[in-house]
Amino acid sequence: MKMKRRIAITLLCFACIMLLLLGRLAQIQLIATESFTKRHINLIEKSVTQRTQAFTLDDGRGHFVDRNGENLGEERYPVLVIFPFLQIKNDMLEKITHIIGVPGQDIKLQMKDKRKPFILQRGDKPFQLTKEQMEKVNRADILGMVAIEVKMKQISEAEHLIGVVGENEKELKKRYEKLKKLSSQTIIGISGLQQSFDEFLMTDGETKVLYQVDRQGEPIFGKRAKYTSPGNPFYPVTIQTTIEKSLQQKAEELVRTHGIKKGGLVLLDVKKSEIVAMVSKPSLQMNDKRAYQKTMENQMLTPHFPGSVFKTVIAAAAIDNDMIQSHRMFNCNTDPYGENFSQVMMGELNFTESFARSCNRTFAVLGDELMQKDKHIMETYLEALGASETVGWKGQMFHTSGFKQLIEEKKATVWNGEENKVGHKAIAQTAIGQKDVRISPLAIANMMATIARNGEKREVKAVKEIRYKNGTKFFYFEDHKLEGRQLSYSTVKQVQSLLRKVITMEKGTGATFQSLPLSVAGKSGTAQTGKEDRVNRWFAGYFPYENPRYALVVVDLETNSKENTVTPIFKEFVEEIAHLEGRR
C-alpha cells in the first residue's frame, strides 16, 4: 500500500514538473514571444539574429543638413562590405581585385581572424568605390561581398552646436517612459541640437544588409544578400539647419590655425537672424568620460566677462538719456576710479574718442551717472539691445509650448546683488564689463545684429525646418521677435556711428580693419578673468556697414598669450566672406 502511494506521489510530482515545463515552453513559444522576462526580450528577434549575419547601413536616426542641403556630421560612402565567415573562393577574389584594383592578398589580410562583416579599408579610412565599380561588383554576384552606400559618422562641422548621441538607459526611460518597446540600447541625443530635437530624430528601425545562414554558417537563400529597412516614407526626418557648411569649415580652420584653446566665434545672418557659423573650443573629446565632460560645454552659449564690449550698452543708455555733450571732455589718463594713473595714457578725450579708443574712465563716470538716474538702467539697456535673456528660438512646437532650439544657452548677468549698485567702484567695474557682468558670445552677436537692424530685436534660429523622408515639410520655424523695450531709431543711428568710428578713427581699437573689402563697425574688448594673468579678448561687429548682412563675434577666452589672435581671425573671416560673395 505504502509503495503504491509513493509511486502515485512520485508520478504526481513528475506530472507537476512536466506541466510547469510545458507552461514555461508555452510562455516562451506562444505567449511571451515579443516581451520575455522583465527585460522585455523579443525572442523572435533573438532567434532570427542568431541565424543572421547582418551589417548596419543606416541606424535610422534623423540627420542634419546645412542651409543648402549638404550633410553635417555624416556622409554616405560607397564601400565594399565583406562577410568573412562565408567562404570566398580565390577566383572570386581575383574577380573583385580586377574590378576595384585592390590586391587579393590585401583583402585576405583584412579578412583574417574576422567573423563579423566589415568595410574594406585603405589605411585607416574606408576604401571608396566609384559608381561604376559598385555596379560591376554587384553584377558579379560574389558570395559574401556587397557594394553599397553606408551612412558613416565623421568629424562634425559645428560639433558643439549639432551635439553628440549615445546610449543612456536612465535618461531614455526618463524622456520616453511611455514608449515601453524601446530597446535599452536605443541611441539618444546627449547634447546640442541632437538633444533638443531628439524626439523627432529617434530611429524607426535600422537599414541592414544580411545573410541568413544555417548551423554550418552557409547561406540559406543563395548568394544574394538581402536588405531590410522599416520602409516608412516619413521617417527618418531631416533637420535643415541655418549653418552654411563652407563658411563653417573656414571658421573652424581659422580658429584651429590661430591656436585658440578656449573660445571661438559666432557668425549671424543679420537679415534672417540665423546662425551661419559657430565654433567652440576646446573641441569635443570623446575618448573617455572625464575628457568629454571637460570639453562638452558650448562656449558660444555660455556667459563670459565681456570687458569693453559692454561699453556699447553704456553708450546706448547715455545717448538715449541725453547725457552726451560734444564739448564734454574726460580725463583718460586715470584708472576707472579716477584715483591712479591709467596703464595707457590717452589724455583728454570726448565721448566719441573715448568709445573708439576704449577709455575706461569715461564709461565708469557715465555708468555712475546713469545709476543715479535708475538702479536698473544697465539691465534695461542690455535688454533693449537684445542680449539680456536667452536669445535662441523658443516657442510652441506641436504639443510642446516651451520648446527651445538652443537648450544649453544661458542668459546674461549684470549684477549678482543689489548691494553692488550703490558702490562707486562696483559700478565702475560693471560699466566696463567686469565685476559680475557675464554675456554669451551668441547674445553679443545678437546685440550687434540688433544694432545693425536699426534696433529691431529678434530671436536667433539654428534650425530652419524639419522635413519628412519624402521631402515634404514637417515643421517650419517662423521668425520670432524678442519682446520688451527697443531703442529709438535716433539712438541706434548714433550707436552705429560710434561702432564705425572704432574702425575709421586713426587710433581706434579696430583701425586695422580699415583695409578690409567689406566695411566693418564694431567694438573690441579685453576683460580680466580673475585667473592670474588670463584675459578674455573680444571683437564684436557687423558688416558691411552701409547694408549689414552679417554680425560676427570672435573671442579668445582665459588666454595668457601676448599675441592677439582675435583680430587676425576676424579679419581673415571677413575677407573669406567677401571672396565667397564675389564668386556668387
Please place each PLM-identified region on the residue numbering.
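Beta-lactam-recognizing serine transpeptidase/beta-lactamase-like catalytic domain environment
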Residues: 60, 269-299, 307, 316, ...
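Periplasmic/cell-envelope proteins involved in peptidoglycan metabolism and beta-lactam response
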Residues: 1-287, 379-384, 557-584
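Bateman (tandem CBS) regulatory domains
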Residues: 231-237, 293-300
